[in-house]
Amino acid sequence: MIEVVAGIDAGGTKLAVRVETLDGTRLCDKEFPAEDWSASPVDTAATWLRERLDRAVPAGYRMLAAGIGAQGCDTQKHCAELETALAEQGLRAVVVNDAALLVPAAGLTEGIGVISGTGAIGVGANADGDPLFAGGWGWVIGDEAGSAGIVRLATVAALTAHDEGNPDDGLLSSLLRAFDVDGPEALARKVNDEATAENWGPHAPAVFTAVEDGSALAGEVVGAAADHLAALVRRLVTRGAVGKDVVAAGSVITGQPRFEAAFRARIGTAFPHLTVTLLEDLPVAGGVALARRHTGNA
């Protein structure tokens, strides 16, 4: 049987699987729904991953190793436990946090990866190779550079301005249209009654639309989100993260040029030695790279 390696990107909404032969021939890129993905308990997570990987690998090929980026694996211990659980199911794997796929996906061996998508997290490594994490707390208490966190910040800003008697500068009305409600009180209920990323995140474009339409308040929200993402990089650098590159991915930073520019400006000012790069390939490419390194076929 022909040996292959795989990359897996297990995020909050979808699972991406890429399978390649050892000579680099790509056999498939597949996606599966991942709303029910959880990194804990590890035995259940391993079964969940193995079942979907088996469905992705074409018949007649043998899986040599997989590189897995798993949302929710936020410590080295957790990653190691999931690796062990996968090994017990016959899968040789290296497991990292999903944000840690970005640097290898960009063809680099060191650097800082930041995700600004549904949530927001930064991942790096120190000179000894130990992983470092910043952010990724979730949209209820953090992740202000993610789509759900941006909507939370914007809603608070718009409702606060309304309570203070300030006229709507466009942010409140943009949110009302996005959530299809007729007033501030209804907006508060709509946001609170379903405090999920699925309810909040898709409305982030309304904040950026308000910025384009001239809302200063929306501009402040976007600036605060860029500050948050830059702060994740600062925390990692302060703790010894190595590398000269910051690799960014996620729907917000890749889909909103104004936000990308704000983030670049902040990194350029605070860390002129760092270069910000938007990931051009899918993050799952980093899983393939990790699998190749794991087997000595890099």
Predicted segments, located by residue:
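Glycine/charged-rich beta-loop-alpha catalytic/anionic-binding loops adjacent to active sites
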Residues: 64, 86-93, 129-138, 266-275
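Short, acidic/turn-prone active-site loops that include or flank metal/cofactor-
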Residues: 31-37, 99-100, 118-120, 137-140
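Short glycine-rich anion-binding loops that position phosphate/pyrophosphate groups of nucleotides
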Residues: 13, 71-73, 118-121
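Short beta-strand-loop/turn "lid" adjacent to the catalytic site in phosphate-handling enzymes
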Residues: 31-38, 54-94, 106-107
